[in-house]
From Swiss-Prot:
Function description: NDH shuttles electrons from NAD(P)H:plastoquinone, via FMN and iron-sulfur (Fe-S) centers, to quinones in the photosynthetic chain and possibly in a chloroplast respiratory chain. The immediate electron acceptor for the enzyme in this species is believed to be plastoquinone. Couples the redox reaction to proton translocation, and thus conserves the redox energy in a proton gradient.
Annotated membrane topology: Peripheral membrane protein
Subcellular location: Plastid, Chloroplast thylakoid membrane
HAMAP family: NDH1_NuoB
One Gene Ontology term of the molecular function aspect: 4 iron, 4 sulfur cluster binding
InterPro entries: NADH_UbQ_OxRdtase-like_20kDa, NADH_UQ_OxRdtase_20Kd_su
Source organism (scientific name): Liriodendron tulipifera
GO cellular component: chloroplast thylakoid membrane; respiratory chain complex I
Protein name: NAD(P)H-quinone oxidoreductase subunit K, chloroplastic
Recorded superkingdom: Eukaryota
Entry keywords, A to Z: 4Fe-4S, Chloroplast, Iron, Iron-sulfur, Membrane, Metal-binding, NAD, NADP, Plastid, Plastoquinone, Quinone, Thylakoid, Translocase, Transport
Length: 225
């Protein structure tokens, strides 16, 4: 497992007093106490549940699962995200205090998976709703891969600068690595307008004249069938 680049200590005096910067101290405290909000909707989340056991013991990384987004600084999405649950996911992310991070776990969360080919209600990538810091592919990813993703996120936190973090835009916070996959022909655009998520469902009203006109032109047997 790769070692984490902890913030450097400036100097140590003769009285064993350690001096450092406030930015390094803040990064060290945050990377050592990530509190995740677990958002599992499918089978990938079962692999994450195995991390709670004694074999992997993810508590040693300072991870304390929280049930409230207001107490979490990391949200881990695992499983398929549908259009109906998209507003709830966006609302949970907006309720999390800054700085906050996102780990997308599994193929269904990253691209929609096998449900994105012929499903009209599947979001083809959670990054169309919220910014993602670490992508964790797999179907499902192994617990060791989840630990590696958390390690990469901790490295990212250790290198952050408070001024850059405040001034950076949300769309530029993604963290990923180069891959060797070849991009094929796109069959689905997967572009979703977040403004549509907050609109109330429209109701179509049929006038009584149109209804009775259609009813008179169709026999009662056809209406039953």
């Amino acid at each position: 497992m790769n070692s984490i680049e902890f913030p450097l200590l400036d100097r140590t005096t003769q009285n064993s007093v350690i001096s450092t910067t406030s930015n390094d101290l803040s990064n060290w405290s945050r990377l050592s106490s990530l509190w995740p909000l677990l958002y599992g909707t499918s089978c990938c989340f079962i692999e994450f549940a195995s991390l709670i056991g004694s074999r992997f013991d993810f508590d040693r990384y300072g991870l304390v699962p929280r049930s409230s987004p207001r107490q979490a600084d990391l949200i881990l999405t695992a499983g398929t995200v549908t259009m109906k649950m998209a507003p709830s996911l966006v609302r949970l992310y907006e309720q999390m205090p800054e700085p906050k991070y996102v780990i997308a776990m599994g193929a269904c969360t990253i691209t929609g998976g096998m449900f994105s080919t012929d499903s009209y209600s599947t979001v083809r990538g959670v990054d169309k709703l919220i910014p993602v810091d670490v992508y964790l592919p797999g179907c499902p990813p192994k617990p060791e891969a989840v630990i590696d993703a958390i390690t990469k996120l901790r490295k990212k936190v250790s290198r952050e600068i408070s001024e850059d973090r405040i001034g950076s835009q949300q769309e530029n916070r993604c963290f990923t690595t180069n891959h060797k996959f070849h991009v094929g022909r796109s069959t689905h655009t997967g572009n979703y307008d977040q403004g549509l998520l907050y609109q109330s469902p429209s109701t179509s009203e049929i006038s009584s004249e149109t209804f009775f006109k259609y009813k008179s032109s169709v026999s009662s047997h056809e209406l039953v069938n």
